[in-house]
Amino acid sequence: FEYMQHIRQIAAKNKVFKTYIGLGYYNVITPSVIQRNIFENPGWYTAYTPYQAEIAQGRLEALLNYQTMVMDLTGMELANASLLDEATAAAEAMHMFYAMRNRDQVKRNANVLFVSDKCFPQTIELLQTRSAPIGIELQIGNASELVWNDQIFGAVIQYPDVDGEINDYREFTAAAKSNHSFVCVCADLMSLVLLTPPGEWGADCVVGSTQRFGVPMGYGGPHAAYFATHEEFKRSIPGRIIGVSIDSHGNPALRMALQTREQHIKRDKATSNICTAQALLAIMASMYAVYHGPDGLKRIAGKIHSATRHLATRLSSLGYTVKTQAYFDTIRIGLNNLCSQELLNQRAIQREINLRYESNGDVSLTIDETTSQVDIKALLDLFAGAAGKDAGSIDSYSTIPFWENFSRSSAILKERVFNSYHSETEMMRYIKKLENKDLALNHSMISLGSCTMKLNAASELMPLSLPEFANLHPFIPSDQAEGYLEIFRELSSDLCQSTGFAAVSLQPNSGAQGEYAGLMTIRAYHLSRGDGHRNVALIPSSAHGTNPASAVMAGMEVVVVKCDENGNVDISDLKAKAA
């Protein structure tokens, strides 16, 4: 009771404004049936990684639904379940493409990855971090001006791009194929409900976030990222893949497939250091698609697009320039000296509205499924008032057809599971049926030990549903997130005190990412001292498989130290190899 009072007081220090920043993070409506029966249900959030398929058939089915949803919407042949976030998913594509270079490319050390300057800024920064230790050079620029050469092995582009623009990349992917280069597309999954999927115009890999499928922003996470590709890449794809098999009685059954790619088996030869990644959030996203079905998703996407079109038309009539030509939910606006960014921002903050302010003086905004007609009127009043004009009244607006030359013609979500459970009762029963096929800590102890074996108390998880924690965008001004910052400061102080270290990073999104961040810090330290040659990592043979996989990603050479049958380090072997 005292704790809940305390945490609510902290939550109250966060300010929940109407936020239109976008950049891969969106306000969502989480269906109550999913929030109550999955997100807040220990039958789902305390289950262990499904290494033992016999006690995980429910979650495996939900994750298979996730893969099917991603494959359908992207137009690809294969998807995993799942990854940590969109930026690291793009980095995983970079690693995969680099490993898949042909013999001639390896021989001439083709090591250049082109990255569109219209990708999200966090994706570009992450690619810069991940590329350096493994010898990949980034070429960042305008995709329409790229001159292909034999040093470029791959490319990363955004669809729709950071300004909301929908580009026709058919010529781009054709040129890439002629150059024997791979193309990764970072795509907004909701836009693909209406938009021609990348799989139909030549993409080799499609990545992105499933956050806007019913998972709150949470000041930046956690959310499940998706990764979709073609069959030819199946032995190089990162992360878990759920496959359909047959049990000992000859009945259909689900299991994790192609595990020989993964760190717990391949270790330093693994395709990635990723283990199970945000499976609970992937399950929530899959259930969002199951609950709404293809027609429901089309209504949601259509509403988002129509509201954006209507807003753009009205802003143009006020004298602003909408610079984005074809768009789904995001527009970039030229102010045309009608007002300054400073004035607009001042008036927006007074009205508790967050927009995205560009370095050249433009303003961008992104519409989402929570945006109502009242919200559109508030935005129009904001822009009109800043220009000294009257926005006038706003009439009900009908659905506006999507751009014909970019419209999707292929069907989505045809499978029975996406066309059966559209009432709360039906959905609740389906979720419960799957839950009953699983073993979680609300049933019994699970006799498997690993980094994920912990029980989050109900009182710890309840605050996650509070709007003051759930509905904050990661790029809002810091004075709107004082509650979060207080928690960060207190947690950082406690961790420093308990570990004896001087500082701590809360950024890593998983244990595997934490060890990678640590190894990258060690690497940076040696480089700062001119000791870049110190690149050997001694790792016990009994260490978790992510350890050697992360060391390789950090550009290190792995030397394995022997262990006894109980996993204890052989000290004599350690001394010999450390000498």
PLM features: residue spans?
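Conserved phosphate/anionic-ligand binding catalytic regions in large, soluble enzymes, centered on
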Residues: 215-228, 232-233, 277-281, 371, ...
